[in-house]
Regions:
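Conserved short loop/turn motifs at secondary-structure junctions
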Residues: 3-6, 104-107, 184-186, 257-266, ...
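Basic, low-complexity terminal or inter-domain segments flanking catalytic cores
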Residues: 2-6, 82, 93, 99, ...
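C-terminal or mid-to-C-terminal helical accessory/interaction module adjacent to the motor/catalytic core
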Residues: 96, 138-222, 257-261
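Amphipathic alpha-helical transducer elements in NTP-driven molecular machines
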Residues: 12-19, 36-39, 43, 79-90, ...
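Active-site phosphate-binding and catalytic loops of NTP-dependent enzymes
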Residues: 26-31, 151-156, 177-181, 205-210, ...
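Intrinsically disordered, low-complexity regulatory segments
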Residues: 1-165, 169, 470
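Metal- or metallocofactor-binding catalytic centers and their adjacent structured scaffolds
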Residues: 236-268, 274
């Protein structure tokens, strides 16, 4: 009997690429076969944790008395729409001619969980190996199959993935039900979603309460340069200094010139790539991940979901060839000499599961013009970063001038580039992008020759007024940065990063917040801001600290890493979350005075003709907000319905403010035709009535 090894990939397209390399080319029902291999696939998560009512039918209804729900024995179930593919995999795994199963799902936490869930439910009868690769290039696939690792080496990764899923289930099920029952509306709460939302709501509160502080600076125009003084808090003092300097002599106290060097940027991990793609290209984090995943499957980029910005030592020798190959494929670098110093990007200690995102050698034969625009743009960013990271430093001389006049001190800086280094590539890319992002401060600025003790005359003195700036609204770029550091904006480069979520999950978290109605993307000039909705602010107002604390959730993420490394027992992690939920259910009480928070703000459309109160639009019509007044214009008003019209916000606003409004397309029951007329509001104190007026000059056609 012929013996086979079964390979299970995460999706059909990856399975086909693997099968082509190992010679499994014969198509079967749900798998490929050949050369002693069978290759099949999952379709994302085939199985997941069971819903609450699977443990007890009473959990189908949301009741406070049933909380917290803490399963003692967890259940995994196959999705109804995934059963066919699961049955194929189960049959293949248990086939007598299959001797070994190879986990070829994505080499990361989620990929491990996707495979292990199916493997466990199928009975775990066959030995298991792990394919762990960072590139879909044929050579990388061959090397991976030649060095399959024991599946048990990744038990820690499986445990971390399963604990993450259980923690999300526990917090999501219990907190969502608790707050939904207490506040009488569905409030979706997530282990990572809620603290991420809290960051945004807190930022908006800081912006709303910000009070700008004016300041003044005195600038002196000298021959060939302008020098500026320090900030002054009151205009009178600034004007006094300006008058004292007008026409006076300035003495150059200090001229200091230093040669400085700016190191090349590190390679991309997923988060830094998503940030740059958002800032430079306007892509959302999810779009960037999707484009990069497609490039990975097309064998043009390495594994996307990485948190490393370095390469391993065994890649040093082949790196110069790759860099030159990449440079030849990028037209914007023409005329710029390409250099390669591998040591700037090699660091084995900073590579865990996967190295940084870089292009592959397949660029050499690829038709990049055939790529979708989004994928091509992301590929160019990745290529640019590789070329910059191994290029020479940017070297420049910086001159600092300090001058004195009328008892005040004034400064200016000059910059002269000695060797552009990696910035030549960046500048060429930006030129291609047609100023996609404004150039940062620090552009080249030459100063005239100056000597200490030299005196110059002031040709003009000017007072410039400014104001302190409020915090900026979050963009996906800046929010990803805040999530990565759990809100600590000044974390040292070498600090242990804990963060909200992982590079693989942050994009999905943002999309969930948008789809749930908690976040709105609002375009502002060249950026897209992330703004919290009314419900988002209300939710964070009532959530206790433990559910919105970025630091606590980041600590949980760190502990998942400890589980992955075998340094923490899964039970200890889950027991801590269960204890927190028990305490939450037992002690939380509805905050007094917050019942109104989850009532959407009502837009006022005009003044009430009866009492002068405010009339606002609600779901079924327009109503006076004065409780003692019954004025209303219903959207299903019979008078309007007979004319096949519904009173809109604009129409009602005009009726309330002007007493009349011109309406087109009114239907005549008598003629069956439409006509235009002026509708006049006549309120008799009990009902809102309407009448028509026609323009006699035009005959008022009906």
């Amino acid at each position: 009997m012929m013996r086979y090894k079964l390979v299970i990939a995460e999706k059909p397209s990856v399975a086909q690429s693997l099968a082509a390399v190992i010679g499994a080319t014969a198509r079967k029902d749900g798998y490929l076969e050949g050369n002693g291999w069978r290759v099949s696939w999952c379709v994302g998560h085939l199985a997941g944790l069971a819903d609450a009512d699977s443990y007890d039918p009473k959990y189908a209804k949301w009741r406070y008395d049933d909380l917290p729900i803490l399963p003692e024995h967890w259940q995994m179930v196959v999705g109804k729409d995934k059963k066919k593919q699961f049955d194929i995999l189960k049959k293949l795994m248990n086939a007598p001619d299959v001797t070994e199963v190879v986990n070829a799902c994505d080499a990361g936490r989620e990929g491990e969980l996707i495979f292990r869930s199916v493997y466990e439910l199928a009975g775990r009868q066959k030995p298991m190996k792990r394919l762990w690769i960072s590139s879909m290039e044929d050579s990388a696939i061959r090397e991976g199959f030649a060095n399959l690792r024991p599946g048990v080496d990744y038990d820690g990764l499986r445990d971390a993935a399963l604990c993450r899923a259980k923690a999300d289930w526990l917090v999501g099920i219990n907190a969502t039900r608790l707050f939904s029952v207490l506040y009488h509306r569905t409030l979706n709460i997530g282990r990572v979603m809620s603290p991420t939302l809290a960051l945004i709501v807190q930022r908006e509160a800081e912006i709303d309460t910000f009070q700008p502080v004016p300041f003044y600076t005195v600038a002196l125009e000298l021959p060939g340069l302008t020098v500026s003084g320090e900030r002054i808090s009151d205009r009178a003092s600034a004007e006094q200094l300006k008058e004292a300097c007008q026409g006076a002599a300035v003495t150059i106290k200090k001229v200091e010139c230093k040669e400085k060097s700016e190191k090349p940027p590190a390679l991309y991990d997923l988060t830094t790539l998503q940030r740059d793609a958002n800032r430079l290209l306007g892509f959302t984090a999810q779009q960037t991940l999707d484009y990069l995943q497609s490039l990975y499957e097309k064998k043009l980029c390495t594994y996307p979901r990485t948190d490393s910005r370095y390469l391993t030592g065994d890649m040093a020798d082949s790196l110069p060839v790759l860099v030159n190959l990449v440079a030849s494929a990028m037209p914007f670098r023409k005329g710029i000499a390409i250099t390669c110093d591998p040591h700037t990007v090699i660091n084995d200690k900073k590579v865990t599961d996967h190295h940084a995102v870089i292009p592959t050698r397949n660029l050499k034969d690829a038709d990049l013009s055939a790529l979708p625009a989004g994928e091509k743009a992301v590929l160019e960013l990745v290529a640019l970063r590789l070329m910059c990271a191994v290029a020479q430093p940017h070297i420049y001389s910086e001159t600092v001038v300090i001058a004195a006049c009328a008892g005040g001190e004034f400064t200016t800086k000059g910059k002269t580039v000695k060797h552009p280094g990696w910035k030549a590539l960046e500048d060429a890319y930006r030129a291609k992008m047609k100023d996609a992002e404004p150039k940062k401060e620090g552009a080249e600025k030459a100063l005239p020759e100056l000597t200490e003790g030299q005196t110059l005359s002031v040709s003009a003195a000017i007072v410039k007024e400014g104001k302190s700036s409020p915090p900026q609204h979050f963009t996906e770029d800046t929010l990803l940065s805040a999530m990565e550091t759990a809100g600590k904006e000044n974390m040292p480069e070498d600090a242990e990063r804990k963060g909200l979520g992982t590079p693989a999950t942050r994009a999905g978290i943002l999309e969930k917040l948008v789809s749930a109605g908690f976040l709105e993307r609002k375009k502002s000039r060249k950026t897209v801001q992330l703004l919290p909705s009314h419900d988002a602010v209300s939710l964070i107002t009532v959530l206790p600290e433990q559910l919105q604390s970025p630091l606590l959730t980041a600590e949980w993420e760190y502990r998942l890493g400890e589980i992955e490394r075998g340094q923490l027992a899964p039970e200890e992690f889950l027991d801590g979350i269960s204890a927190m939920l028990k305490d939450l259910v037992g002690t939380y009480q509805v905050i007094k005075g917050t019942e109104y928070l989850f009532t959407p703000p009502r837009e006022v459309v005009g003044k009430c003709p009866r009492c002068g109160g405010e009339v606002a639009e609600l779901q079924k019509g327009f109503f006076c907000q004065n409780d003692s007044c019954k004025f209303a214009i219903w959207k299903n008003n019979k008078w309007w319905a007979a004319k096949k019209k519904q009173p809109t916000k604009a129409v009602v606003s005009a009726l309330l403010n002007d007493g009349r409004v011109r309406v087109t397309g009114l239907y005549s029951e008598k003629t069956g035709k439409t006509y235009d007329a002026t509708v006049v509001l006549e309120d008799d104190g009990q009902y809102a009535n309407f009448k028509l007026e026609f323009d006699q000059r035009k005959g008022g056609s009906r």
